[in-house]
């Protein structure tokens, strides 16, 4: 906490993103500790000179403007994916003209702009009636950029658990690495171990390290041996101009 106080001194704003939620707590765990550290630094400033600091291992905030405005964000609930656009939204929230929400959620839609079915519309109306401001708690960025390296190849597979899609993806990753020397990042979407259930597999290969770790919204090729894929997914989502669907 002594290092945190020194790092945050004089900052205009600080956003803390945590992959947890504690609805009955005053704050989430990390932001709670950071807020306590800032409070101790302010107490040091109120005490005056260095010799009279109440917390000698903490920084001294001599004026109120030394303390940053703190924002708290919650992400990844229910294993939901965090996109680069979500991080952009967290930063835009702090900027002048932004929403300035002190607590918010990323990567989750409490209510959607358009319901998929009439029953879902009824359900969302019930949520809006019970929680009128629930939509204000979700934040999205103004854009979701493609941060994959230049020359990257991105593939998404839609299949059914037990059909061997995961093994196919693993073999493809090993082949690209051994023959081309590409850096590989690949992962099955959660739930792929359930036989008979729809599953998704993501793979990207690039001549340099791949720094992002999320589902790919920009893909060069989509492979699907599942004839019913359009009934439970949108396999064309994120397919680039000139991309391939097999």
What kind of region is each of these model predictions?
Residues 6-13, 144-152:
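Glycine-rich phosphate/diphosphate-binding loops that line cofactor/substrate pockets in enzymes
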Residues 17-136, 141, 161:
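Peripheral docking tails and interdomain loops at the edges
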Residues 22-24, 78-80, 163-165, 192-195, ...:
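Flexible loop/turn segments at secondary-structure boundaries
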Residues 236-246:
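ADP-ribose/adenylate-binding Rossmann-like module
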